[in-house]
């Protein structure tokens, strides 16, 4: 039987720019492919670019990077069934593993040791109907939830979702992140930036312990830079 393979867009070592691990050195494994076309997507190159690699070769490359923190991302990593083999291989070697997913696929299939970061799509994203509603039932304290906010309507929707799903206390953290300017291309519509100061005011007025999240890596390197 041949070894499981995954379509990999890139593997790189950088500063984690999001989540409660923000600021830490991290190895990133970016998988190819995504069924969504969010207007503000900053990794649309991962929709179609990538090469098949064995799980063993992926783990070997990660082992050469000077960190025990690994994030599996995309694209949408859960569209590739063998991603679960990769998760288990990394976890079994003692890595702390994060996976970022849109929640479009069943998150309950993920190894219980992993930290799931669920990026729930808002109405203005262009993919609001993509979330698998049963995933709310599987959320746990090991998880984090992120909403990328494009405007006040998005904020209000995300706030209501946070309340109705009782996310505060159910997950490790709830992040609200402002959209950064994104040019459109043949795959995505593009988006205008939301002022972080504006979002900060909305978060403060909410009275909830929501985390304002800025993409740290985009303040270090050019926003369109790859491999960071």
Task: Annotate each language-model stretch with its function.
Residues 78-228:
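Conserved AdoMet/S-adenosylmethionine-binding subsite of the radical SAM
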Residues 1-32, 36-40, 205-211, 220-222, ...:
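Flexible, acidic/Gly-rich N-terminal and inter-domain linker regions that tether
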Residues 20, 41, 50-53, 70, ...:
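Short linear functional motifs in flexible/disordered or boundary regions
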Residues 32, 74, 149:
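Conserved residues at beta->alpha junctions
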Residues 6-13, 25-28, 36-115:
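Conserved Radical SAM active-site core
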């Amino acid at each position: 039987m041949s070894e499981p393979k995954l379509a990999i867009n890139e593997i790189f070592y950088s500063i984690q720019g999001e989540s409660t691990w923000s600021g830490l050195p991290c190895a990133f494994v970016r998988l190819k492919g995504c069924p969504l076309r969010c207007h503000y997507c900053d990794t649309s190159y991962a929709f179609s670019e990538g090469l098949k690699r064995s799980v063993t070769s992926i783990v070997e490359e990660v082992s050469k990077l000077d960190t025990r923190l690994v994030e599996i991302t995309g694209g949408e990593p859960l569209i590739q069934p063998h991603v679960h083999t990769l998760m288990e291989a990394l976890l079994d070697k003692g890595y702390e593993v994060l996976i970022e997913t849109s929640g479009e696929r069943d998150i309950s299939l993920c190894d219980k040791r992993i930290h799931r970061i669920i990026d729930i799509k808002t109405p203005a994203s262009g993919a609001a109907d993509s979330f698998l509603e049963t995933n709310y039932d599987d959320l746990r304290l090991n998880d984090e939830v992120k909403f990328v906010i494009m405007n006040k309507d998005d904020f209000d929707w995300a706030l209501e979702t946070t309340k109705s799903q009782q996310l505060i206390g159910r997950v490790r953290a709830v992040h609200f992140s402002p959209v950064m300017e994104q040019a459109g291309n043949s795959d995505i519509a593009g988006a205008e930036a939301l002022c972080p100061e504006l979002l900060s005011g909305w978060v403060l007025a909410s009275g909830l312990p929501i985390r304002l999240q800025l993409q740290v890596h985009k303040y270090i390197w050019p926003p369109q830079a790859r491999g960071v």
